[in-house]
Amino acid sequence: MVNFAEVLDKSLLIIMAKWHGFGRCKTRLSRDIGKTNSAKIQSVMTNHTISTAKSLQNIKLVDISIAISGLGERNCRRWSKVLGIKKFNLQGKGCLGEKMKRQIIINKKFCVQNKIKNIIFIGTDLPDLCHLDLLTTIKELKQNDLILGPSNDGGYWLIGLSEKIISKHLHLPFINIKWSKENVLQNTIDNFAFTKLKYKFLDKKLILIRLLILKIESNQLA
């Protein structure tokens, strides 16, 4: 049996998560299905993402950090403990690009101390995320500087950054992006087109919120 931890570089997996408080998450979705169901969807997807991440943590391929919005530090600590995640940080203010850059800076010392080479960012909007998605990302970061998982809405569901990028914060591809637009992925690619960075795409995935809506309407969620 292959011991992946011996042949692959360890990564820090940062999960960008939002507290699933009533009326405080998935605001656009809340208008369609109600605040209670919207909060329930957020909770289900967060728990699924955490469970998937832990499957790689258990084989020592990743350390997990959860970057939280929607709560103060004290409640973030409490929630991360409930989720079984030891390491957490507040996302802070700004656009998504600014928040991700902040997480890189905050975690830089931790990465050096723990000999972590790469940083991978994921959100909690992908119900069909599986451990193979993350394992493939870690494998591809051996040969590439940047990994992107395109989504059906013109953005991406994952971004993986190699040591070459994060060590000096050079050419961070998600800076100066107009988020929530259809060309987020293309703008990200354009940001490093002039560099010699190597990149690769993962398979395109659907942001399957609608599937969860149907399950709720059919009373299939616990």
What residues fall within each predicted segment?
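N-terminal nucleotide-binding beta1-loop-alpha1 segment
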Residues: 1-29
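Short aromatic-hydrophobic micro-motifs that form the base-stacking/packing surface
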Residues: 118-122
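Short beta-strand/loop segment that forms part of the nucleotide-sugar
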Residues: 62-71
